[in-house]
Amino acid sequence: MKAVLKHELSGYFHSLTVYVFGAFLLVFVGIGSMLYNIQQAVANFEYVLGFISLIFVGLVPILTMRVLAEERKQRTDQLLYSLPITTTDIILGKYLALLVVFLIPLVIVAFYPLIFAKFGDVYLLTSYGSLIAFFIMGAALIAIGMFISSLTENLGMAAGICVAVVLFNYYSVSLADYISSSVIGSIIALVVLILIVGLIIK
């Protein structure tokens, strides 16, 4: 697993992916901080994280679409499976590498509440609690993106399905209002959803 982790991190830091991801995340955090914490003088940093959470729709597919789909497309996945490591080690190594890439800009963001606290009252406990929740949500979406990437070798399809799944995750509560609360209605909705996903993957 360590070998896969080192290899993946080396690949990320020798490409633009990690830098573009980090730059976009920090730019949007900066915009959110300016709008809420500076212009409106709001002491809650969690509002900023709530504001920027929708960027996962674009960033997660970009970050995850190549993880396994590219391996299948170039047939290098067979080389990985021939190594004296388990499939679990390969997946965990790739996943941990993505988490490191995601965590790096968040370490920088972690200093924002402390900086704002020097100029006013900031709720540090809720700010860092929200930051941890933000990381957990990102980690979950990255795991979903990795799974989708494993289903196809088409990078565009992997990204498109990931965008659809992330959007569904955000708006599932709103969509629930349009679905019957009865058992039969729920089963029909689930079957339709499974068929749609199956057709997309096919």
Identify the function of each model-found stretch.
Residues 19, 88, 155-156:
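Residues that define the loop-to-transmembrane-helix transition and helix capping
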Residues 29-36, 40-55, 97-162, 170, ...:
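Secretory targeting signals
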Residues 56-63, 138-143, 190-199:
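Hydrophobic cores of alpha-helical transmembrane segments in multi-pass inner/ER membrane proteins
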Residues 7, 11, 70, 82, ...:
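Transmembrane helix-loop junction
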Residues 67-97:
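Helix-loop-helix units of permease transmembrane domains in multi-pass membrane transporters
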Residues 1-70, 200-202:
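Hydrophobic alpha-helical transmembrane segments
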Residues 35, 155-202:
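Transmembrane helix segments
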Residues 2-6, 88, 92, 96, ...:
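Alpha-helical membrane-protein architecture signal
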